[in-house]
């Protein structure tokens, strides 16, 4: 189930570092972003797992490409009236998840191009990186392709973790 992330004008290097790590953990195929703020923030080296070596990360002028995105289902993730609560959402097979900036919202014109709009039903708005993590976890939790053995644990845990459940 291909996953692509689109971040509109990301601001915080810490958020982008967390988003990169989440993209690696949840096996996203690509991350695209608009704006110039992240290019300046990259100097802070927040990609501690070097995810950018495995996942295509690219700057784009337009968050939705009318030519290449025709096979992707576009999903805006935003606190928008009329949006579907994430717990009730069925994730499409090939998805482009679009997230707004930390200090703004997704423009109406972009929302209008999306097949779905979802929101996370919390009290107050969430941090951008937290929103990406929750959405990606929700997608994983609703899939039938989850591993059920210890192999994923052994491959994912920190090198100092050798703890076992009884």
PLM segments and residue spans:
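Structured adenosyl-cofactor binding patch, chiefly the S-adenosyl-L-methionine
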Residues: 25, 113-151
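Short secondary-structure transition/capping segments
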Residues: 42-46, 87-89, 130-131
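A short acidic, often aromatic-flanked loop/helix-cap motif at beta-alpha or helix-coil junctions
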Residues: 62-67, 82-83, 125-127
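Active-site/ligand-binding-proximal alpha/beta "capping" segment
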Residues: 80-118
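RNA substrate-binding interface of SAM-dependent RNA methyltransferases
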Residues: 1-78, 140-166
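Short, acidic/turn-prone active-site loops that include or flank metal/cofactor-
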Residues: 36-38, 101-104, 121-126
């Amino acid at each position: 189930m291909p996953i692509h992330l689109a971040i509109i004008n990301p601001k915080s290097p810490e958020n982008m570092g967390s988003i990169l790590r989440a993209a690696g953990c949840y096996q996203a195929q690509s991350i695209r972003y608009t704006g110039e703020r992240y290019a300046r923030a990259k100097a802070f080296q927040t990609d501690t797992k070097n995810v950018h070596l495995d996942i295509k990360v690219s700057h784009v002028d337009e968050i939705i490409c009318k030519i290449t995105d025709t096979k992707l289902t576009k999903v805006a993730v935003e606190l928008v009236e009329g949006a579907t609560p994430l717990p009730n959402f069925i994730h499409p097979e090939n998805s482009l998840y679009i997230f707004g900036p930390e200090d703004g919202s997704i423009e109406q014109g972009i929302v209008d191009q999306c097949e779905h709009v979802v929101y996370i039903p919390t009290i107050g708005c969430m941090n951008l990186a937290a929103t990406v993590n929750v959405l990606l976890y929700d997608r994983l939790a609703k899939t039938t392709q989850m591993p059920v053995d210890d192999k994923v644990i052994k491959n994912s845990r920190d090198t100092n973790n050798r703890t076992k459940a009884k």
